[in-house]
Structure formats: structure tokens, C-alpha cells
Amino acid sequence: MEAGEAAGAVLFLLAAAVSLLAAVSTGALDFTYLVTVVGEGSSTSPGSGGGAWWREAWVGARSRAVAPALQVGVWACMVMSVMLVVEATYNSAVSVAARLVGWRPERWFKWEPLGGGAGAGDEEKGEAAAAAYPMVMVQIPMYNELEVYKLSIGAVCGLKWPKERLIIQVLDDSTDAFIKNLVELECEDWASKGLNIKYATRSGRKGFKAGALKKGMEWDYAKQCEYVAIFDADFQPEPDFLLRTVPFLMHNQNVALVQARWVFVNDRVSLLTRIQKTFLDYHFKAEQEAGSATFAFFSFNGTAGVWRTEAINDAGGWKDRTTVEDMDLAVRATLKGWKFIYLGDLRVKSELPSTYKAYCRQQFRWSCGGANLFRKMIWDVLVAKKVSSLKKIYILYSFFLVRRVVAPAVAFILYNVIIPVSVMIPELFLPIWGVAYIPTALLIVTAIRNPENLHTVPLWILFESVMSMHRLRAAVAGLLQLQEFNQWIVTKKVGNNAFDENNETPLLQKSRKRLINRVNLPEIGLSVFLIFCASYNLVFHGKNSFYINLYLQGLAFFLLGLNCVGTLPDHCCF
């Protein structure tokens, strides 16, 4: 059993223990008869005899200690819920307003087209025309990327840019000799076609992706490049990517980064990828656009962006102290006074994790790394001299505290622990505005920026309820720097040619797994707990009726606990 499963099992056992005590105390479960028979050897009717004293003791303890303690948690969650809904409303409102007024980066930052067109035309015009283009390096970090290495290398080699002004650097950290050989042969094939493509390896994987990017910047040929674009192994930029991004950097000397938006080649493959699309579309449409439009802060997404080399060096270069090296560099560059540009209409194709396990590992890495970076950067942000106080508040409060800590905490503690337990603790008070109105408001503001994903938003809410368990565990691991806080597991890809031409049916068949090997114990445990609480609420009506929501949450945990969401074509999956 992994550490995460053990932690989930402990959480379930604690919640189940509280539920059992509450159920016994209210009379839903009565073991007095069994206690009396065993202790006295006599037949006594349930509910009578000497065993009733401990029930009364528990009721007293519940009203004097348990309920007050949980009530503190309730009000803490209410405060966090308000923080969360205000943050979401602000992001959605700003992004909608920016769209309505036609806000575009070109209005605030100078942009002029380069020359007369693409690389082929520049070759005809000669060296004089090509000299107008700055030296650009494109980095493609990869690790055992058998399924996608050709896609990314081919797409990057198709970028429109003078060949003599472009260096393509494939940073291969693969440990599989067969895959390394294939990647190297692919690079040699493109080099034979006249492209300046470099195949770079290193001994060991120190620093993981950050270490590879840092090592790549140390090569002599890299030092002559003014700008560096980064694409993960599953990303496929359009040919005009550099033509649309680099001019912003050339004409605005205070701009360090131009970030593009992600789109997905496998978003219709399964319910899992559809829900991921809903989440990421909101991130790009609301959070990234709001941070860009207000000149506050938005983070580098780790790929599909172009950096000014000077800014990378000024910020201290790539660091491997967390699993979110992209966010780390973005924050440090911002504190140095550099500005970022987000281009929401420039889209780069990529691949979503197609299995639940892969998605959980990706989200753990992102959540743990973000929380850990929050811990490491608090003082640096507070003492920074080149950013305003408002930007410091935005970075620490909005970007880090609310999104990295508050969001997973309130989602799990309130909706998966406190509300279920409350159906068996009548002394607990839950304000209706906190458990009904705020979730509804969050649903609405999310739907406003996701109209094309409206049908998946309710499912996304249930899915996020499950994922909050993993994100909260990751946030705690990052904040406390537990043993697993700096683990890096590469997200498994399958390649978009693993699906049919309509991007709907998986063609790659996976070997059949035994049911026991597919079970996720924390999810199954929480599903049992939630369904028990829902059934208790249905049978023994209290002052609140949460059983419908609890049944839905329990079903969501159960399906994900059996890995029934994702691309497992051999099984009954959605």
C-alpha cells in the first residue's frame, strides 16, 4: 500500500469511528443487548440494562466537546468558502469584462510582424533578411516518451523561422536505451534535412525536468540565443507560433515571458478527459486571463511559452527545489520586475492524462509543489523591492493561499467530512448560505467562463470533490515538506495517433487487469463512509437533508475507486 493509500485509509477510519459513535449515541445502532448478554449472561431487551450509561456519557461528550470542536471547523470552512467564492467571482468577472471590452495584449504591448513571412521566404531573400530574426532555441524535455516523441519533434521542426536562426534542442533523460536510440535517430533524420537540431543527454536525472532545462542552457550554442521556447514532449505548436510570440519580446524589453493556451487532442476520449478539459479551460479562460488583464500575476504553465534568456538568468535560472520549476521561475522573475503576456487566442495542442492514476499523480505533483513553493517564497515575496504591495498581496493571498491551500482544504474537509458527519451530530450548526448558496455561486461563475462545457460542470464538481482528497494530502505534504514532497513521476502519454480520426475511440488496447489491482482503497473507503452517512440521513431524518448530495459524492468516490473513469477499454469505463 502506498503512503497516499495509507493516509486515505487513516482518514476513513477516523471519520468512520466518529460516525459509528454518533450512530450509537442517537440510537441508530444499539449494541446494549450484546453487551448485556456477554457481560451478564442474561437476556435483556435492547436499550435497557447497565450498558446505557456509556451512551449517555457519549451524548454528553458529543455536546460538550465533539460538536464544539467541529463547529470551529465549520466556521473555519465558512471563512475559506467565502475566500474561494470571492476569488472565483473576481477571476470570472475580470476575464468576462476583458472579453467584452476587447482587451488584447497588442493594445498594451508593442507588436510588429517580422519581415515578410516565414522561413522559406527568408532563405530566398538571403542572409540579410534572416538577420532580422533573433536567435531562438526551442527546448523539448522528454523522458521515455515512446508514444509522443515524433509528434513534438516533428511539430517543432515545422516552425516557421529561418533555419540559421533556430536551434532545436531535444533534452532526452530517457532511461530506456531502445527509446533513447529512437529519439536520437529521429533527431539525426531531421538534421539531415538541414535543421539545426541538437540531441542532448546527461548522466543521471538530478533535478528532473528543471535539471534538464538548466543543463540545456549551459551548452555554448544555447548562450547565443536571445529567446528560448519550451514544449513538453506531448505538445504540438502550430507553424506560426514563434512568429506570433517572439515580436512581443523583441519590442518590449521588460517582458520576460509570452504564454500560450493549451488545447487538447484527446479531450473527447473519456469522461475523465472531458472533466479535465473543463478544469483547464477555466484555468486558462479565467485565472490566466484575469492575471494578465489586470497586470497582476499569472504563472508560466511549464510549456507552450517563450522566455527571454536574460530574464531566466536574472531570476536565478532553473531550480529543482520543488516539483513546479515553472511556477518557481515565474514567481522569481516577477519579483525581479519582469512582465508576462498571456495570449489566449494562441493555442497549442497537447495531451491530457487518459487514466485516473496518471491524473492523480500529475495533480499531486502540481499541488504539492505549489504548496511547497508557497512555504519557500513567502519571505522573498514580502521583501521584494521591484513589485508593488498590491502585487505581493495578489501573489501570496490569491495565487498561493486561496488556490493552493484553501481550495483543496475546504473542498475536502467541509464537503467530505463535516457535512457527512453533521447528519449524526444534531448539535452541529451548518449555515445554509455556506453549504448551499456558496457552492451554487461557484457552479455559476465556473459555468459562465465554460459555456461549451456546461454539461460537464456538475460532473466536474463531483470529480473535484474526489480530487480534493489527493490535493489536500499533497498540499499538506508540500507545506510540511514530508518525505514525498519532492517526488517526480512523469505523466504517462499515449499519443494522439492512439485514437481514431474522430478523437473518440481508444485504439490502444491495454492488458486486462484483475479487479483487485484496479481498486483505489482511499476512494473506496470514503465512498463507504459517504453512503453510510447518506443512508443514515435518509432513514433518520435530522434538521438537514443532505442524502442526495452524499449519495452522489459516494457514487463518485466508488466509481473512481474502481478506476471506472478513463481509457480502460477492456473494462466498463466511461
Curated annotation (Swiss-Prot):
Q: Which reaction does it catalyse?
A: GDP-mannose + (glucomannan)n = GDP + (glucomannan)n+1
Broad EC category? transferase
User: Any idea which GO molecular function terms this record carries?
Assistant: glucomannan 4-beta-mannosyltransferase activity; mannan synthase activity
The residues annotated as the active site are: D173, D326
EC assignment: the record states 2.4.1.32
> Any idea which UniProt keywords this protein has?
Cell wall biogenesis/degradation, Glycosyltransferase, Golgi apparatus, Membrane, Transferase, Transmembrane, Transmembrane helix
- Kindly report the protein's main subcellular placement as a broad class: Golgi
**SUPFAM superfamilies per the UniProt record, alphabetical:** Nucleotide-diphospho-sugar transferases
Its GO CC terms are: Golgi apparatus; Golgi membrane
Task: Report the membrane topology from the UniProt record.
Answer: Multi-pass membrane protein
The organism's place on the tree of life at top rank = Eukaryota
Q: Where in the cell is it found?
A: Golgi apparatus membrane
Which GO terms fall under biological process for this protein?
Answer: cell wall organization
Where along the chain is substrate bound?
D232, D234
InterPro entries, sorted: Glyco_trans_2-like, Nucleotide-diphossugar_trans
Give TM regions.
66-86, 405-425, 428-448, 521-541, 546-566
> What's this chain's function?
Probable mannan synthase which consists of a 4-beta-mannosyltransferase activity on mannan using GDP-mannose. The beta-1,4-mannan product is the backbone for galactomannan synthesis by galactomannan galactosyltransferase. Galactomannan is a noncellulosic polysaccharides of plant cell wall.
Q: Which family does it belong to?
A: Belongs to the glycosyltransferase 2 family. Plant cellulose synthase-like A subfamily.
Recorded protein name is Probable glucomannan 4-beta-mannosyltransferase 5
Q: Which organism is it from?
A: Oryza sativa subsp. japonica
